[in-house]
């Protein structure tokens, strides 16, 4: 299918001073779009933390939050108000602040961060809800949600109902502050295959609801920080394991370089684990005293997240393609995103009717994943731009019997027909892709789909963009095409039959084909009444008849007398 020239470029891009890719919006629109997205994230955030219900997938929320920060930086706006933390209803102070964790983009960033740091360990980044556990005199006295890192909700009554969390401790842990992740216990969870399952939202929902004490049995705890604990990491892990926090010991590995981090990351991505993860965390054994911990200032640890299975992508344009059969397909051009090491910059939406149902316009944010064979797939629209500037689709008068001859309105279907006839399913013209056909047609102004047969070697050589070797190859391919059997030429003319049916017909000339009745076509493999009627319509089409006479004049096998 070829792209329709009339397309809507609704969102141009520019690079900000920070290097971010920015939409080229007027200031008023930028302010409006930022405010709308900020409010939507705040609403989702409020529902999530107050009701324990996720109105949007965790990954989508995270990516849209990052998109908001990007936009704010583009216009030089303060990003401190971005709603990435829960609304502050809780007033219980954390004895030790939650620092959060810096995100590293790739292995190179990991190598750079590790440089100059020693005694490093890696842990899975368990996907759940962060909590502070406070033990005093050997008993669990308080459990506090992360909140804004300084204060949060008092979750003590709920946490005491979770069987996997020790209610008593001894030794150094008798009086200790622990930070960790409450997670949904899984049996044999393989992250690469099963994904995130919205685990974070499920955990939050269980902790927020008042009538689900039995559901808390499915929750576990992974301790990732013991502020002011033993300086020696093996000793720290051993004591945690003895106290009942065994997962920390099992899933904390010493690492010396980025290669070891990468191996652990890949292993945990593909192995069966008891929890959902979204990456790994690298941390130094040596940590500052807890009184120095502040939100956003934990420079002794960093995260390397897994690439998301689906990416939020920004629609930059809507394009229309017309195939050889006249079918119009809508394609969304995207600001490029990376999925499974594949650069994705366009996704097929489908028919015009489906596009209208999706209501997608340039500037919208859509969720894209990879379907079978790595083909980009549209999953959902996660955010719509305020401005709904949509292009007008081309006229829908195209069909399987239009555009065998070139015209202004037939440009794209005509090119599609040329690409088809050059494919291995028809004449097998090696090296003749869409770009080559466009160059020849634009230079020599083909009258119909077989006009290229009349080109001379000099004309091909003089086509802009064709090197000597390429023009000679094309000339050879065009000459070889003349020797192709009759059935290949009929396929090139887009007869509505399969190759198997055409071979079964036994026709080896245009004269034989003209003698066939509709009843004859019905008897061929995979050819019912409807298709047989289409064959008759195709054969009797004036353009097809004219092309058959033209091919006869060119002495193509099967078309002469």
UniProtKB/Swiss-Prot annotation:
Active site (UniProt): 125 (n6-amp-lysine intermediate)
One GO MF term: DNA ligase (NAD+) activity
Documented EC number(s): 6.5.1.2
Pfam families recorded: DNA_ligase_aden (PF01653), DNA_ligase_OB (PF03120)
Matches recorded under InterPro entries: DNA_ligase_AS, DNA_ligase_B, DNA_ligase_CS, DNAligase_adenylation, DNAligase_N, NA-bd_OB-fold, NAD_dep_DNA_ligaseB, NAD_DNA_ligase_OB
SUPFAM superfamilies named in the record: DNA ligase/mRNA capping enzyme, catalytic domain, Nucleic acid-binding proteins, RuvA domain 2-like
Gene3D superfamilies assigned: 5' to 3' exonuclease, C-terminal subdomain, DNA ligase/mRNA capping enzyme, Helix hairpin bin, Nucleic acid-binding proteins
Domain of life per record: Bacteria
Residues of the signal peptide: none
Enzyme type, top EC level: ligase
TM annotation in the entry: none
Catalysis: reaction(s): NAD(+) + (deoxyribonucleotide)n-3'-hydroxyl + 5'-phospho-(deoxyribonucleotide)m = (deoxyribonucleotide)n+m + AMP + beta-nicotinamide D-nucleotide
Keyword Ligase: yes
Keyword annotations of the record: DNA damage, DNA repair, DNA replication, Ligase, NAD
Any one GO biological process: DNA repair
PROSITE patterns in UniProt: DNA_LIGASE_N1, DNA_LIGASE_N2
Biological role: Catalyzes the formation of phosphodiester linkages between 5'-phosphoryl and 3'-hydroxyl groups in double-stranded DNA using NAD as a coenzyme and as the energy source for the reaction.
Family annotation (NCBIfam families): PRK08097.1
Entry similarity comment: Belongs to the NAD-dependent DNA ligase family. LigB subfamily.
The name this protein goes by in its record: DNA ligase B
The organism of origin for this protein: Salmonella paratyphi C (strain RKS4594)
């Amino acid at each position: 299918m070829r792209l329709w020239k009339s397309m809507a470029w609704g969102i141009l891009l520019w690079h900000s001073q920070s290097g971010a890719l920015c939409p080229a919006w007027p200031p008023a629109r930028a302010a409006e779009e930022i405010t709308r997205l900020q409010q939507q994230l705040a609403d989702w955030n409020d529902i999530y933390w107050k009701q324990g219900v996720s109105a949007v997938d965790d990954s989508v929320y995270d990516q849209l939050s990052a998109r908001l920060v990007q936009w704010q930086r583009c216009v030089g706006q303060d990003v401190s108000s971005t709603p990435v933390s829960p609304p502050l209803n809780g007033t219980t102070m954390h004895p030790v602040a939650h620092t959060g964790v810096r995100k590293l983009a790739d292995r190179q960033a990991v190598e750079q961060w590790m440089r100059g740091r020693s005694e490093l360990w890696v842990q899975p980044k368990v996907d759940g809800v962060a909590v502070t556990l406070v033990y005093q005199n050997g008993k669990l006295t308080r459990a506090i949600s992360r909140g804004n890192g300084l204060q949060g909700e008092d979750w003590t009554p709920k946490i005491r109902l979770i069987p996997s969390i020790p209610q008593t401790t001894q030794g150094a842990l008798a009086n200790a502050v622990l930070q960790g992740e409450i997670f949904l216990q899984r049996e044999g969870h393989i992250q690469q295959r099963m994904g995130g399952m919205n685990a974070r939202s499920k955990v939050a929902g269980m902790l927020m609801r008042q009538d689900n004490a039995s559901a808390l049995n499915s929750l576990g705890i992974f301790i990732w920080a013991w502020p002011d604990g033993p300086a020696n990491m093996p000793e720290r892990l051993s004591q945690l394991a003895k106290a009942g926090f065994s997962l920390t010991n099992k899933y904390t590995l010493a690492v010396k370089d980025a290669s070891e981090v990468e191996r652990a990351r890949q292993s945990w991505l593909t192995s069966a684990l008891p929890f959902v993860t979204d990456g790994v965390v690298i941390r130094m054994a040596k940590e500052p005293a807890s009184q120095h911990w502040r939100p956003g200032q934990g420079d002794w640890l960093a995260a390397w997240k897994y690439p998301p299975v689906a990416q939020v992508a920004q629609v930059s344009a809507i394009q229309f393609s017309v195939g050889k059969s006249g079918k119009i397909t809508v394609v969304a051009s995207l600001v490029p995103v990376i999925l499974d090491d594949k650069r994705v910059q366009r996704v097929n939406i489908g028919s015009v009717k489906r596009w209208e149902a999706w209501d997608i316009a340039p500037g919208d944010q859509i969720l894209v994943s990879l379907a079978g064979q790595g083909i980009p797939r549209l999953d959902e629209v996660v955010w719509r731009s305020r401005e709904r500037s949509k292009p007008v689709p081309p006229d829908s008068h195209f069909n399987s019997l239009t555009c065998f001859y070139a015209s202004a309105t037939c440009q794209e279907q005509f090119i599609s027909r040329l690409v088809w006839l050059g494919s291995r399913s028809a004449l097998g013209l090696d090296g003749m892709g869409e770009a080559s056909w466009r160059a020849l047609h634009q230079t020599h102004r083909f009258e119909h789909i077989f006009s290229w047969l009349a080109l001379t070697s000099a004309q091909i050589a003089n086509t802009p963009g064709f090197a000597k070797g390429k023009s000679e190859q094309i000339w050879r391919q065009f000459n070889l095409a003349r020797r192709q059997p009759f059935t290949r030429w009929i396929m090139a003319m887009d007869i509505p039959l399969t190759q198997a049916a055409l071979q079964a017909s036994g026709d080896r000339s245009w004269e034989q084909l003209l003698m066939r009745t509709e009843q004859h076509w019905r008897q061929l493999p995979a050819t019912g009444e409807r298709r047989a009627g289409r064959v008759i319509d195709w054969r009797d089409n004036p353009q097809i008849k004219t092309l058959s006479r033209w091919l006869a004049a060119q002495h193509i096998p099967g078309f002469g007398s």
